[in-house]
Curated annotation (Swiss-Prot):
Disulfide bonds: none
Annotated Gene Ontology cellular component terms: extracellular region; host cell plasma membrane; membrane
One biological process term in Gene Ontology: killing of cells of another organism
Highest taxon of the lineage: Bacteria
Subcellular location: Secreted; Host cell membrane
Hemolysin-type calcium-binding repeat feature ranges: 715-732, 733-750, 751-768, 769-786, 789-806
SUPFAM superfamilies named among the record's database cross-references: beta-Roll
InterPro entries associated with the record: Hemolysin-typ_Ca-bd_CS (IPR018511), Hemolysn_Ca-bd (IPR001343), RTX_C (IPR013550), RTX_pore_form (IPR018504), RTX_toxin/Mannuronan_C5-epim (IPR050557), RTX_toxin_determinant-A (IPR003995), Serralysin-like_metalloprot_C (IPR011049)
Entry PTM: Acylated by LktC. The toxin only becomes active when modified.
Bilayer topology: Multi-pass membrane protein
Gene that produces this protein: lktA
Transmembrane segments: 230-250, 297-317, 359-379, 381-401
Protein name: Leukotoxin
Record's keyword terms, sorted: Calcium, Cytolysis, Hemolysis, Host cell membrane, Host membrane, Lipoprotein, Membrane, Repeat, Secreted, Toxin, Transmembrane, Transmembrane helix, Virulence
Length: 953
């Protein structure tokens, strides 16, 4: 409670001093007011009832008042009760601090004494001047009253007003009443902020006593609904009536000019017929003063009053209450999930909106009054006292109200703070804002449950593990800033769920997800043989957060974020065949950004994965990755994301399945973790909170290196990749792009994918599939198999040694066209795509033209096979080409296909081919996680005696 009082008193200090400073600058006439009050009937008198007793030994408040009054030049008089009664009769203000009598302005000593004896007020006023003694408190109060009266009553001839009971006296009484109200409001603000609506109501009632302002008084009196029980939504809706204008103001896409127009309409409704009422009042004063009230003068007054109304102020109020209404609706769902923070935020918006609406309505009306009076008084010496009086009153009210808003706002924020602290007290060990993230996650889970329950079928996995990163939430950030609890808020929270057979399981016993230590353990697979680990949203880097709130200015604070980072994620798999898509795991950290938001300095988080048993698939992300495939047939995919071309050189590797993958990621946009700043405002107080989140940021090019162990197959990127195989059996899939693939030694399986690729099988019995694009294929030494399909484009094959085969896996042999073009054999399918076997006829032609020529090369493919297993040998091709003068006739091909002996030979050869390629993998390069990523299967259907080569989708 002490801290609360200190905070409020500090705000009061600022408000009081600023008000005094502002009043001292209101003009020369106001500056002279204090001196004029010390002479004649304008003097201030401290009245002490004759029978009022006080203990001089205890040094109570009244003694301090007397001493302070004497020092300030204020007359001190003890009077009989009947003299005090005169003051009460004059204005009925003996219960107030101030009264007005024939002798001057009366300060009621008992009332001031009571104020100073209130502990809270004494503390507040004392702390405002850094004083603790009663004398100083008394002096502060009296000097403040002098300052206010100096402005309110500047330029007034009180002697004449008291004698004639003129209109000016009515205004003087109203000014004095307003001053009384303001003094009470300031003196009791420590305990009456909740009742601010009532204060406004009282002020409205007092304004009704001023001739011509009854309409304004009625409107302000209507603000009494702004108390802590109703908090203003209904009242403000009534006050800010006018559906059309309200809709315009609520429209975020409405233009400024349209909002201004709507604001004028709305403002006129707020103050009723304020222009008319104030104009009539001012014209009446001019008549009383014997001044002109002609049409042009009236028009000048009315236009000046209208211009004094600020429409945009009311636009802001409408927006604030619309926001509160939206928050209330939004909060309903999360309240059911155990989080009431959005409702607290709505409560804050309603509370501060109430204050804003009240102050803005009053200031708007007062500005209209002051503007109209100034217009009426233009060029008139007689009317100057009225203008000065009204300007003084409106200036005092506006200044004090405006600079009291911060204390009022902080009071509303303190209530929010206390509710959060109380919740955490009643829920030991829990964090209120973390509870907010929990509720957000549960709502997200509910919204997506149907989709998630269908993932087992979509991903064709017995178990699906879904990891969700709940990232920074602006509402939670606002609440943390408003409540001054930014040190407790988190940047987000990660959650894990499991799904089996369309059922949602508790994942805490199946999966270990520790974001603080960087651990993801999915090895407890139970009876599940296949599982898919899906990162639904970008997962932030591992580590722990700590925040520190520091003050950077009078009202400016920043909550700095300090991160104790862990340099890697450690992933552990078990016996199941698992698929990991790591492209949504954030590995790049933007340490420094330029003014445009481009990353200029980065840090990397490594991923270390131990896959265990099973046939696993890993889709690599943007940073360094170490993978130990363990047992089973494991594939590493680089086909998702845009993380640079691969360069693999395994020529010196000493273990099968070991590769070093170098990547260069060119400049562009990629997923980064960056630190941003959230800003929340509480009146003048600005709270900045640092938080981290993921975002696609522009970056410079960078290198990264992956280490693979016990990996059976690598799928490349959409860039131009380079693969150099080992001396062992390699399986490379180039993916998209113009790839260069060299199998080196071993029996390799090489697939080009899309693009015009260059593939060299090297030594060994290689399986080569160029894929789509115009590819250059070289078998090298060994018994190689080439594959071509319709839609693959125009391929060129160079072959030298071995018993080689070419399969047109989706074309009938008799539908192909064979012809000799120069030294080459060109085979054309029904799509007019050509496969050119380079130098097929070169050796034979050399033998014909060069005497005693001995062939040194075998550039032919020994068998060419159709989709149903039908085939033609190189010998048959030569014979039929020669017979057909460079082209095989269609009838001759038909005979080959129909020949029984060839078919029998085809079946025998198919059995041999089946043994050769039965271990070949089904190549995959799909970006669709729903594809079946199967284990290796035979690619021969013996029942059809046909070769069926699986390909990338």
């Amino acid at each position: 409670m002490g801290n609360k009082l200190t905070n409020i008193s500090t705000n009061l200090k600022s408000s009081w001093l600023t008000a005094k400073s502002g009043l001292n600058r209101t003009g020369q006439s106001l500056a002279k007011a204090g001196q004029s009050l010390k002479t004649g009937a304008k003097k201030i008198i401290l009245y002490i009832p004759k029978d009022y007793q006080y203990d001089t030994e205890k040094g109570n408040g009244l003694q301090d008042l007397v001493k302070a009054a004497q020092e300030l030049g204020i007359e001190v008089q003890k009077e009989e009760g009947n003299d005090i009664a005169k003051a009460q009769t004059s204005l009925g203000t003996i219960q107030n601090v101030l009264g007005l009598t024939e002798r001057g302005i009366v300060l009621s000593a008992p009332q001031l004494d009571k104020l100073l004896q209130k502990t809270k007020v004494g503390q507040a006023i004392g702390s405002a001047e850094n004083l603790t003694k009663g004398f100083s408190n008394a002096k502060t109060v009296l000097s403040g009253i002098q300052s206010i009266l100096g402005s309110v009553l500047a330029g007034m001839d009180l002697d004449e007003a008291l004698q004639k009971n003129s209109n000016e006296l009515t205004l003087a009484k109203a000014g004095l009443e307003l001053t009384n109200s303001l003094i009470e409001n300031i003196a009791n603000s420590v305990k009456t902020l909740d009742a601010f609506g009532d204060q406004i109501n009282q002020l409205g009632s007092k304004l009704q006593n001023v001739k011509g302002l009854s309409s304004l008084g009625d409107k302000l009196k209507g603000l009494s609904g702004f108390d802590k029980t109703s908090l203003g939504l209904d009242v403000v809706s009534g006050l800010l009536s006018g559906a059309t204008a309200a809709l315009v103001l609520a429209d975020k896409n409405a233009s400024t000019s349209r909002k201004v127009g709507a604001g004028f309409e709305l403002a006129n409704q707020v103050v009723g017929n304020i222009t008319k009422a104030v104009s009539s009042y001012i014209l009446a004063q001019r008549v009383a003063a014997g001044l002109s009230s002609t049409g042009p003068v009236a028009a000048l007054i009315a236009s000046t009053v209208s211009l004094a109304i600020s429409p945009l102020a009311f636009a802001g109020i409408a927006d604030k209450f619309n926001h509160a209404k939206s928050l209330e609706s939004y909060a309903e769902r999360f309240k059911k999930l155990g989080y009431d923070g959005d409702n607290l935020l709505a409560e804050y918006q309603r509370g501060t909106g109430t204050i804003d609406a009240s102050v803005t309505a009053i200031n708007t009306a007062l500005a209209a009054i002051a503007g109209g009076v100034s217009a009426a008084a233009a060029g008139s010496v007689v009317a100057s006292p009225i203008a000065l009086l009204v300007s003084g009153i409106t200036g005092v009210i506006s200044t004090i109200l405006q600079y009291s808003k911060q204390a009022m706002f902080e009071h509303v924020a303190n209530k929010i703070h206390n509710k959060i602290v109380e919740w955490e007290k009643n829920n030991p060990g829990k964090n209120y804002f973390e509870n907010g993230y929990d509720a957000r996650y549960l709502a997200n889970l509910q919204d997506n449950m149907k989709f998630l329950l269908n993932l087992n079928k979509e991903l064709q996995a017995e178990r699906v593990i879904a990891i969700t990163q709940q990232q920074w939430d602006n509402n939670i950030g606002d609440l943390a800033g408003i409540s001054r609890l930014g040190e407790k808020v988190l940047s987000g929270k990660a959650y894990v769920d499991a799904f089996e057979e369309g059922q949602h399981l508790k994942a805490d016993k199946l999966v270990q997800l520790d974001s603080a230590k960087g651990i993801i353990d999915v090895s407890n697979t139970g009876e599940a043989k296949t599982q898919h680990i899906l990162f639904r949203t970008p997962l932030l880097t591992p580590g722990t957060e700590k925040r520190e709130r520091v003050q950077t200015g009078k009202y400016e604070y920043i909550t700095k974020l300090h991160i104790n980072r862990v340099d890697s994620w450690k992933i552990t798999d078990g016996a199941a065949s698992s698929t990991f898509d790591l492209t949504n795991v954030v590995q790049r950290i933007g340490i420094e950004l330029d003014n445009a938001g481009n990353v200029t300095k980065t840090k990397e988080t490594k991923i270390i994965a131990k896959l265990g048993e099973g046939d696993d698939n890993v889709f690599v992300g943007s940073g360094t990755t170490e993978i130990d495939g363990g047992e089973g047939y494991d594939r590493v995919h680089y086909s998702r994301g845009n993380y640079g071309a691969l360069t693999i050189d395994a020529t010196k590797e000493t273990e099968q399945g070991s590769y070093t993958v170098n990547r260069f990621v060119e400049s562009g946009k990629a997923l980064h973790e960056v630190t941003s700043t959230h800003t929340a405002l509480v009146g003048n107080r600005e709270e900045k909170i640092e938080y981290r989140h993921s975002n696609n940021q522009h970056h410079a090019g960078y290198y990264t290196k992956d280490t693979l162990k016990a990996v059976e197959e690598i799928i490349g990127t959409s860039h131009n990749d380079i693969f150099k195989g080992s001396k062992f059996n390699d399986a490379f899939n180039g993916g998209d792009g113009v790839d260069t693939i060299d199998g080196n030694d071993g029996n390799d399986r090489l697939f080009g994918g899309k693009g015009d690729d260059i593939i060299d099988g090297g030594n060994g019995d290689d399986f080569i599939d160029g894929g789509k694009g115009n590819d250059l294929l070289h078998g090298g030494k060994g018994d190689d198999i080439f594959v071509h399909r319709q839609g693959d484009g125009n391929d060129s094959i160079t072959e030298s040694e071995g018993n080689d085969k070419l399969s047109f896996s989706d074309s009938n042999l008799k539908d192909l066209t064979f012809e000799k073009v120069n030294h080459h054999l060109v085979i054309t399918n029904t799509k007019q795509e050509k496969v050119t076997i380079q130098n097929w006829f070169r050796e034979a032609e050399f033998a014909k033209t060069i005497q005693n020529y001995v062939a040194t090369r075998d550039d032919k493919i020994e068998e060419i096979i159709g989709q149903n297993g039908e085939r033609i040998t190189s010998k048959q091709v030569d014979e039929l080409i020669e017979k057909g003068n460079g082209k095989i006739a269609q009838s001759e091909l038909t005979k080959v296909v129909d020949n029984y002996q060839l078919l029998k030979y085809s079946r025998d050869a198919s059995n041999s081919l089946d043994k050769l390629i039965s271990s070949a993998s089904a190549f995959t390069s799909s970006n669709d996680s729903r594809n079946v990523l199967a284990s290796p299967t035979s690619m021969l259907d013996p029942s059809l005696s046909s070769i069926q080569f699986a390909r990338a989708a």
